[in-house]
Amino acid sequence: MRMSLKLVAAAAALASVFALTACDDKGSTAKKAEEPKAAAETKTAANEPLKVGFVYVAPIADVGYTKQHDIGRLYAIDKVGKDKITTTFVENVPETADAERVIRQMINDGNKLIFGTSFGYMNYMQKLAKEYPDVKFEHATGYKSAPNMTNYNIRFYEGRYLAGMLAGGATKSNVIGYVAPFPIPEVLQGINAFTLGAKSVNPKIQVKVVWTNAWYDPPKDTDSAKTLIGQGADVLTQHTNTSAVASAAEAAGKMVIPYNSDMKSVAPNAQIAALVLNWGPYYAKKINQALENKWENKPVWMHLKEGAISLENISDKVPADVVKKMEEVKAKINSGEFHPFTGPIKTNEGKEAVKAGETLPDDKLVTMNYYVDGVVGKVPN
């Protein structure tokens, strides 16, 4: 599979003072991330559990992107076995030099396999990979690699197309609101696939986007959702890492298709479906590879058909005929008969993006920098 992104996102602007929490899979003792110590021994003694570290950009307490990664960590512990691995995670790590400090501390604590789960960790992980060739590094949603560093992602756009179909069928106002973090290819793929899916069942729809310039900022997400509702949106979705958009939809009596996690707990009436990410099987696979000395630095871009992303808890607020059509399209995506970015596709400025009968190849997907027809506005610089 091809590697994912090709453009570097601006780092999320987060407070300079923050609390870092580290926990293992056997307890919940909290501690502040320590300053780096002298380099630890790089070889794990025979029969000792493999130490595996996870670095998170947001708290695991909030349903969303980081929560799904932690569910994946727990899945891996269950599948691989507590006798074989010990896992540690640090949450609320910003995409700054603090990420390097936290990862270096993990290395000094003896972790031999480290998963960095946010795009902005990429350069720090690559730097450390060169310094510590006996440690294996896995970076989510990035594109840089090294002999001991690879990257992994999910083809979110496949699920986004299907979610867009449901939103297009459910909307009454024909305005759908999309809260987005940074205008990088991964996010634009999602916006565009969602819009194409919505237009396939409802050509009248418009998708309006508000950019937060942050992966995790609940107040910004709330304000953005309120702005979109004020602009006429009656269905919302998001690419950010919080549950705030779902909560705002619930409070306003609107509909929402949350991304990352099922958010029925915060939006019991508003949620009409949930686009859920499943990282667990990948984590279990790569941890087992490391244990068996078969780890590979092969970039992976996982598909819908692999169960890496799924639409769950579809509400009866979505017309039955739209759900039926969505299931048919899902089957075609899984079989390879249909690709969300098969032409003809035009940008919202009327330019040809994909010719009729052609399918956008991966090297074009990972450099996407435009909106398709149906999205309102211009992509910010």
Label every model-predicted segment.
Residues F18-A22:
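C-terminal motif of bacterial Sec signal peptides marking the signal peptidase cleavage site
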Residues M1-A10:
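Bacterial N-terminal signal peptides that target proteins for export
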